[in-house]
């Protein structure tokens, strides 16, 4: 999707649909930075005065610019606090975002720029107190500003302190991005990619640096190359206040903010309870400071306006003003301004240094080297016609006219019509009187001029930050990729474990079903065998009974026949008695046979019951054996499955270990490659910076050499003038002496005296001529030597400075490399400990599971045997109760019915 085409409803809701060029009128540039420009404007519908930050998202890094805009808009939308800038809305117009916010008079940095001296301690405390309230609000919502500095602490007309420029802010805490302005960066931000994450305490460090900035007009290390400052901050001790005139409370506050170790640094809430910000101070301290600054800005602008008027009059008269007249007027205004400035600001005795920190919202522009104030004294501006035109899609880059509420300075004298450009410049200083500001026109123009100039250092720092962010993205992308790979690996292993568990469960279910089927089959077979056994016994007993009955019949017949024979042989016994004896014998025989038959049936029944009981006992024992076999089979199966599971877990652990080591190696290799690339870039940047500084010094020396003849000529003319003055004096003295000698000597000696005086005058003039030539030669030699010595000293100083910066870079890179190697060693040791601990836990788990399995095996077998023993014991007791005795030694009949 093309950036700016709002198809996503969530993104579309971030922007208003109105045309900003129609809604806002009277746009005037009041600031500039790497992001674009900031404009003063008026809402055409409500007449509300606002500040508009224009940010283009076309050209290079379009996607990154668009994402930065979205992040800043989302960040600003959620802010609602008296000490944060009020968000009014955001509009889109032709690849440019119009970020509308409340208008503020200027920044704390502008106060330093206007007064050219540090602020008073009570003023610093008031500004710091307001900034701390804003930071406490941000930090309580897990937000980080990440670019706290004087240029981003704004002031309103009633003296309210506002935090601004959230382009570098983080919506998550902790964070680990390399962002911010070098001189104000906390050490953990500089080392973020190398050592880890940071939190809101980075803002506390930046606030401490800002306190030093307000107390000394510039942050520590500001005279150092920005890249070198980064290396210095990362590895050296925290800075402190230099002057001894600050109170102990202020010093403790700054030292507290600048604790090197983040864990020892206070939070914003803790700092709000510090004596430095809680002590009594005048309620109007900031209002008075703002008013004094506005007065000073007005005086500076009036001075510039008068300079423009001079140029106008000079052009009108077609000739320059009298030099002495101009100097006199300038001196008058300058003296007035000096008197005014001496009555403003701090009474500290800290030397006033012309340092331009600026109030740019961009974090990069604050890296500018100390600028010579004289370069921005004269400000060239265009008139209102090119500025107020709000219908054009792009406001002209020089539209920076200011308007004040107070009345302008009028001039009753009619002014001739000058040229357009000069007239516009003069008009600018009158129009600036229409709105309140604490930022002078020269400061705004200087910001624009600095931004328009090709700033190699700014581009270098932007490229360096971009590279660090890209490196971080690469690391995050690799970490995410490795995490996804590890998640996929673990998911695969988990699925394998689940599959094994499912398969094991299925196998156990199959085994259980198989065993149930076997038991059921055995039960059926046993029932059939028992029935068959019973039938066989019954059949045999029936057969035995039949045989027995037949035997009895035969025996009965034999006995009957035998008795009959005996009776027949005994003829003495009567027949009737014989009959009775035969009948009685029959009855006895039948009774005996009946008893024998009954006894046989009883024996058969007993035999049947006893053998059936014994058969049941055998079946029960066989069932017990099957149960034992089944439980052994089940337990053996479980053990086999558990051993397979353990082997699989060990294999998984080894594969995970191998993957973890490979991933750690890949991550550390990328990190080292990125650090090498970063160090190479830092070295190239430093070498490029060294060459640029040497080129600049060489150009300066060449200009000095080119300028030297003019300077020598001027000095020669000065010496010549001195010689001429001396000659004139001597000539006057000669005339006076000649007149005196002629008056006091006779007339006849006049000729001799005139000749003598003439010779003396000639001799003295010759001496003067010799002295003149000698002075010229000495001056020439002296100036040439002085220039050579000065240039050589400058070269030597530059070489020494660059060498120190290079040594600083090497030390920083060495430290980073050592820290990274130590980090890698810690990561490796941590991984080894984690792998070793995990393996120990796995082995312990395996031992515990095997022990639990063995315990389960023993308990289940024990319980089974005990149950079977109780069952047999109960069965035997029942058998004894039934009168069967010991069935263990019972022999089966020849036929095995089992």
UniProtKB/Swiss-Prot annotation:
Modification N6-acetyllysine, positions: 830
InterPro entries for this protein: Kinase-like_dom_sf, Prot_kinase_dom, Protein_kinase_ATP_BS, Ser/Thr_kinase_AS, TAO_STE20_kinase
Binding site for ATP: 30-38, 53
Modifications made to the protein after synthesis: Autophosphorylated. Phosphorylation at Ser-324 by ATM following DNA damage is required for activation of the p38/MAPK14 stress-activated MAPK cascade. Phosphorylated at Ser-324 and on Tyr residues during T cell activation. Phosphorylated by LRRK2.
Record keyword Metal-binding present: no
Region feature Disordered, mapped onto this chain: 316-362, 405-425, 565-596
Cellular localization per UniProt: Cytoplasm; Cell membrane; Membrane raft; Lipid droplet
Tissue: Ubiquitously expressed at a low level, and highly expressed in peripheral blood leukocytes (PBLs), thymus, spleen, kidney, skeletal muscle, heart and liver.
Record: active site: 147 (proton acceptor)
Annotated effect of mutating residue 165 to A: Loss of serine/threonine-protein kinase activity
Modified residue annotations for Phosphothreonine: 357
Entry's EC annotation: 2.7.11.1
Record's keyword annotation contains Cell wall biogenesis/degradation: no
Keywords: Acetylation, ATP-binding, Cell membrane, Coiled coil, Cytoplasm, DNA damage, DNA repair, Kinase, Lipid droplet, Membrane, Nucleotide-binding, Phosphoprotein, Serine/threonine-protein kinase, Transferase
GO cellular component: cytoplasm; lipid droplet; plasma membrane
Low complexity composition-biased segments: 352-362
Function: Serine/threonine-protein kinase that acts as a regulator of the p38/MAPK14 stress-activated MAPK cascade and of the MAPK8/JNK cascade. In response to DNA damage, involved in the G2/M transition DNA damage checkpoint by activating the p38/MAPK14 stress-activated MAPK cascade, probably by mediating phosphorylation of upstream MAP2K3 and MAP2K6 kinases. Inhibits basal activity of the MAPK8/JNK cascade and diminishes its activation in response to epidermal growth factor (EGF).
Protein name per Swiss-Prot or TrEMBL: Serine/threonine-protein kinase TAO3
Species name: Homo sapiens (Human)
């Amino acid at each position: 999707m093309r950036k700016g085409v709002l198809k996503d409803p969530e993104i579309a809701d971030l922007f208003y649909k109105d045309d900003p060029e129609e809604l806002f009128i009277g746009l005037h540039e009041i600031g500039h930075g790497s992001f674009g420009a900031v404009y003063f404007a008026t809402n055409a519908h409500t007449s509300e005065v606002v500040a508009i930050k224009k940010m283009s998202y076309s050209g290079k890094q379009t996607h990154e610019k668009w994402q930065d805009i979205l992040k800043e808009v989302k960040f600003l939308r959620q802010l609602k606090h008296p000490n944060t800038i009020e968000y009014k809305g955001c509009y889109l117009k032709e690849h440019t975002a119009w970020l509308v916010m409340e208008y503020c008079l200027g920044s704390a940095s502008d106060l330093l720029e206007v007064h050219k001296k540090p602020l008073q301690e009570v003023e610093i405390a008031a500004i710091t107190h307001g900034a701390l309230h804003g930071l406490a609000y941000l930090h309580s919502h897990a937000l980080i500003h990440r670019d706290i500095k004087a240029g981003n602490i704004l002031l309103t007309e009633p003296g309210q302190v506002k935090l601004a420029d959230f382009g570098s802010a983080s919506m998550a805490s902790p964070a680990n991005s390399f962002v911010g302005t070098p001189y104000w960066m906390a050490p953990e931000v500089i080392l973020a990619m190398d050592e880890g994450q940071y939190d809101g305490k980075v803002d506390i460090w930046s606030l401490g640096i800002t306190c030093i900035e307000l107390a000394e007009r510039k942050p520590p290390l500001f005279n150092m190359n920005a890249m070198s400052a980064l290396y210095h901050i990362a590895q050296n001790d925290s800075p402190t206040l230099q002057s001894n005139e600050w109170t102990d409370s202020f010093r403790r506050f700054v030292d507290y903010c600048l604790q090197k170790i983040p864990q020892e640094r206070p939070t914003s809430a803790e700092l709000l309870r510090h004596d430095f910000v809680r002590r009594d101070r005048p309620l109007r301290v900031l209002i008075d400071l703002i008013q004094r600054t506005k007065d000073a800005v007005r005086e500076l602008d009036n001075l510039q306006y008068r300079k423009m008027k001079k140029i106008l009059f000079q052009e009108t008269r077609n000739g320059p003003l009298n030099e002495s007249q101009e100097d006199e007027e300038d001196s008058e205004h300058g003296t007035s301004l000096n008197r005014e400035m001496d009555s403003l600001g701090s009474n500290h005795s800290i030397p006033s240094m012309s340092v331009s920190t600026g109030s740019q919202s961009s974090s990069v522009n604050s890296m500018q080297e100390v600028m010579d104030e004289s370069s921005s004294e004269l400000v060239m501006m265009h008139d209102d016609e090119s500025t107020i035109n709000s219908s054009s899609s792009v406001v002209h880059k020089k539209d920076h006219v200011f308007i004040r509420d107070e009345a302008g300075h009028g001039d009753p004298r009619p002014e001739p019509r000058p040229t357009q450009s000069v007239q516009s410049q003069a008009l600018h200083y009158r129009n600036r009187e229409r709105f309140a500001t604490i930022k002078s026109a020269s400061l705004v123009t200087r910001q624009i001029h600095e931004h328009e100039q090709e700033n190699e250092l700014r581009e270098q720092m932007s490229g360096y930050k971009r590279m660090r962010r890209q490196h971080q993205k690469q690391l995050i992308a690799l970490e995410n990729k490795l995490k996804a790979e590890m998640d996929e690996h673990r998911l695969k292993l988990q699925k394998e474990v689940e599959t094994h568990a499912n398969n094991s469960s299925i196998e156990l279910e199959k085994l259980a079903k198989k065993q149930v089927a076997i038991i059921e089959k055995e039960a059926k077979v046993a029932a059939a065998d028992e029935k068959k056994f019973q039938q066989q016994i019954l059949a045999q007993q029936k057969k035995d009974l039949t045989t027995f009955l037949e035997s009895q019949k035969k025996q009965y017949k034999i006995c009957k026949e035998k008795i009959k024979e005996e009776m027949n042989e005994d003829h003495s016994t009567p027949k009737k008695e014989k009959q009775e004896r035969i009948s009685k014998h029959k009855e006895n025989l039948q009774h005996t046979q009946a008893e024998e038959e009954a006894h046989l049936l009883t024996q058969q029944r007993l035999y049947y019951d006893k053998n059936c009981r014994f058969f049941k006992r055998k079946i029960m024992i066989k069932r017990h054996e099957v149960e034992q076999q089944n439980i052994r089979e089940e337990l053996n199966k479980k053990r086999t499955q558990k051993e397979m599971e353990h082997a699989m877990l060990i294999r998984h652990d080894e594969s995970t270990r191998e993957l973890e080591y490979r991933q750690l190696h890949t991550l550390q290799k990328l990190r080292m490659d990125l650090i090498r690339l970063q160090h190479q870039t830092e070295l190239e940047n430093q070498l490029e910076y060294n060459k640029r500084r040497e080129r600049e010094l060489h150009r300066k020396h060449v200009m000095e050499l080119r300028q030297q003849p003019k300077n020598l000529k001027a000095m020669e003319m000065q010496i010549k003038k001195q010689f001429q003055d001396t000659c004139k004096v001597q000539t006057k003295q000669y005339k006076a002496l000649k007149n005196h000698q002629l008056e006091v000597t006779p007339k006849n000696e006049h000729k001799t005296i005139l000749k003598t005086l003439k010779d003396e005058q000639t001799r003295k003039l010759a001496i003067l001529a010799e002295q003149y030539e000698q002075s010229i030669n000495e001056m020439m030699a002296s100036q040439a030597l002085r220039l050579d010595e000065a240039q050589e000293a400058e070269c030597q100083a530059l070489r020494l400075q660059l060498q120190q910066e290079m040594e600083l870079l090497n030390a920083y890179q060495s430290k980073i490399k050592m820290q990274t190697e130590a980090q890698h060693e810690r990561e490796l040791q941590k991984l080894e400990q984690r792998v070793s601990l995990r393996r120990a836990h796995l082995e312990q788990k395996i031992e515990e599971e095997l022990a639990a399995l063995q315990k389960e095996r023993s308990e289940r077998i024990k319980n089974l045997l005990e149950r079977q023993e109780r069952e047999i014991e109960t069965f035997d007791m029942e058998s004894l109760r039934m009168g069967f005795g010991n069935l263990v030694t019972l022999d089966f009949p020849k036929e095995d019915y089992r």
